[in-house]
Amino acid sequence: IKGVRYTPEMFLKRMAKSKRLENIKVRHMNTLYSLCWIFQLRIAIRVTKKTTRYAGYYAGFDEIAMTPGKLAMLPSWELSDVPAQCVLQDKLTEDQALERTWEYNKTGVQRKFRIMSAPPVLEEHVTERMYKPLYLFEFHNTELDEKKYKVLDSLTGDLEDISIT
C-alpha cells in the first residue's frame, strides 16, 4: 500500500522533539509487511418481492489487527520487491477473510437500506491482496542500558510491544 499516513522519518522526528525522552535512543531497524485483504463487493438488495437493486462496496480485512472494515475507496499501491523474511505469514485464507468482512459489513448495509424485504445477499466479489508496511523500532534506554522493540503500524499509528528472540 502506498501513501501511508505514518512513516519512520515522521516518528523519529517526533521522538527527537520530546525533552522527556532525552535518555532514550530510537532507531528504525526494519520494515515488515502485513497482509490486508481488499474486497470489491456486489450486493443484491431486495426492495420488494419482485424488485432487486444492486450496490457496490469496498471492504477490507487487516490481518495484523484481525479486524474487518469498510473502505471509502481503493488504496493506491505499487509493486516492489521485498525479502521473504520481511513478509509476515498469512493468518487467514481468502474465504475466511471474506466471510468475516461480509458479516461485519452486512449490518451496515441493513442499516443504510431499511426498506429491504429480505437480508442483503453477497453476489460477487473481487479480491486484492495488498501488504501494508509495519516499522520495527529499537528503543535503547541509556540510563538503564535496556533495549525494547516496538512495531509502528503505518495506517493507524499504533505502537505495539514485541519480543525478539
Predicted regions and their residues:
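Charged, low-complexity helical/coil segments in non-catalytic cytosolic or luminal regions
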Residues: 1-143, 147-148
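Acidic, serine/threonine-rich low-complexity disordered tracts
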Residues: 142-165
